[in-house]
């Protein structure tokens, strides 16, 4: 299953002019993204993939979004999401952390079946751009 999920995002991007992605930060929100659909003009539309946001993951854990939630905790969140969903996952990787750790993190995410990781092009302490603190 991880290998199927890993390539699913790439297939979607080849096959569709755009894809619908919704944030999920735990099993419940993943289940909602997995099952929700809407009918419009005779077509049923649903989400194609999930965005696992560091902001939402941190907030759900009662922590600030400053990379305080460690990688092991992020992996646990991803595993909870994967238990209830088959959709591709795009992970918010923040600044990527230490370069020495990034290779390990990417390999772990590949083994899990995460389709993409987004790394911010910033240096220094993580600051959430949604709060106007860049």
Predicted regions and their residues:
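Hydrophobic faces of well-ordered beta-strands that scaffold small-molecule active sites
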Residues: 20-26, 50-52, 89-93, 117-119
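Glycine/charged-rich beta-loop-alpha catalytic/anionic-binding loops adjacent to active sites
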Residues: 13-14, 59-64, 87
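Alpha-helix-loop-beta-strand connector modules within alpha/beta enzyme cores
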Residues: 4-7, 64-91, 112, 132-134
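Short coil/turn connectors at secondary-structure junctions
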Residues: 15-18, 44-48, 85-87, 112-115
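Glycine-rich, proline-tolerant flexible connector loops at the mouths of alpha/beta enzymes
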Residues: 37-73, 96-99, 118-134
